[in-house]
Amino acid sequence: EGNAAGLGLLPLVTQFEKNKTVQHCETQFATDLSGVWTALSDVQISGYEIHQGQTTQHPAMAKAGDVAVCALPNALGWQNNKGNVLGIYLHGLFEDEAALKALFGISTPILDSVFDGLADYIDHHFEPQFLNKLIKN
């Protein structure tokens, strides 16, 4: 419980709490994202919600006109008003096919398939004895 200084990229404050939230989550980005994150507007994504506290607008910064935009429901994501910073509590954004397609315009391989391909390559090109020797040294 308590607080600590963040990076200062978003006008937010987080009150840390005793219990940590870790759960699979499916959600949808807001329809009005701006800047480099516009492509994610209205995109449905899934990932793991991981955080230990509640994040809200920083009162003093909000009074001064520096307000973060809610990017995901339930305070899971925020964007600064310039549109160049996006902070989210949803881990796995760059493993979500819909997010990758929205951001890069193409379907890209997800991390699991990359590791599967690497494992297949190693299995095909290396003898088990050689790999065991590497591991033991």
Predicted regions and their residues:
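Cysteine-nucleophile active-site neighborhood
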Residues: E1-S46
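Short, functionally important structural connectors and interaction interfaces within domains
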Residues: G2, C70, V85-L86
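Generic hydrophobic alpha-helical scaffold/packing signal
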Residues: P11, H24-E26, G47, H51, ...
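Short, glycine-/Ser/Thr-/acidic-enriched flexible segments
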Residues: T14-Q15, D32-S34, H51-Q57, V85, ...
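Short conserved micro-motifs at the rims of enzyme active sites and ligand-binding pockets
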Residues: N19-T21, P59-M61, E97-A102
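Acyltransferase
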Residues: A75-N137
